[in-house]
Swiss-Prot record:
Has a similar 3D-structure to Cas2 proteins. The gene is ghoS. It is an enzyme of class 3 (hydrolase). Antitoxin component of a type V toxin-antitoxin (TA) system. Neutralizes the toxic effects of toxin GhoT by digesting ghoT transcripts in a sequence-specific manner. In concert with GhoT is involved in reducing cell growth during antibacterial stress. Overexpression leads to transcript level reduction of 20 other mRNAs involved in purine or pyrimidine synthesis and transport. Not seen to bind its own promoter DNA. The keyword Transcription regulation applies. GO terms for molecular function: RNA endonuclease activity. This is Endoribonuclease antitoxin GhoS. The lineage of its organism: Bacteria, Pseudomonadati, Pseudomonadota, Gammaproteobacteria, Enterobacterales. Changing F14A: Still digests ghoT RNA. Disruption phenotype: Essential; cannot be disrupted unless ghoT is also disrupted; in the double ghoS-ghoT mutant has no visible phenotype. Increased biofilm formation after 8 hours at 30 and 37 degrees Celsius, has risen higher by 24 hours at 37 degrees Celsius but has fallen by 24 hours at 30 degrees Celsius. Approximately 2-fold increase in swimming motility. When single ghoT mutant is grown in the presence of antibiotics carbenicillin or cefoxitin initial metabolism is significantly increased over that of wild-type, after 14 hours wild-type is slightly less active.
Length: 98
């Protein structure tokens, strides 16, 4: 049986109260340390800057595994409560430009 690695590009968006803005600077650094990016190519291959609360990654992980990884890494941050939305890059741009 031949194994295939299927890679997908996901965009992770955070939603948090504005009072957490200083903590978000640490979160942003953490995301970059985990190889997330703030720029991603759209379906036409054009690089696009994501909004300030969004990050992209190309990975073989499933969306649920990405969320688990982020929440695990965030345990070192101060006790914050944030919503996390993970979608494929195509879904992100469809939602963003509709």
């Amino acid at each position: 049986m031949e194994g295939k690695n299927k890679f997908n590009t996901y965009v992770v968006s955070f939603d948090y109260p504005s009072s957490y803005s200083s903590v978000f600077l640490r979160l942003r650094s953490l995301m970059y340390d985990m190889n997330f990016s703030s720029i991603v190519a759209d379906e036409y291959g054009i690089p696009r800057q994501l909004n300030e609360n969004s990050f992209a990654i190309t990975t073989s992980l499933a969306a649920s595994e990405i969320e688990d990884l982020i929440r695990l890494k965030c345990l070192d941050l101060p006790d914050i409560d944030f919503d996390l939305n993970i979608m494929t890059v195509d879904d992100y741009f469809r939602q963003f430009y509709k």
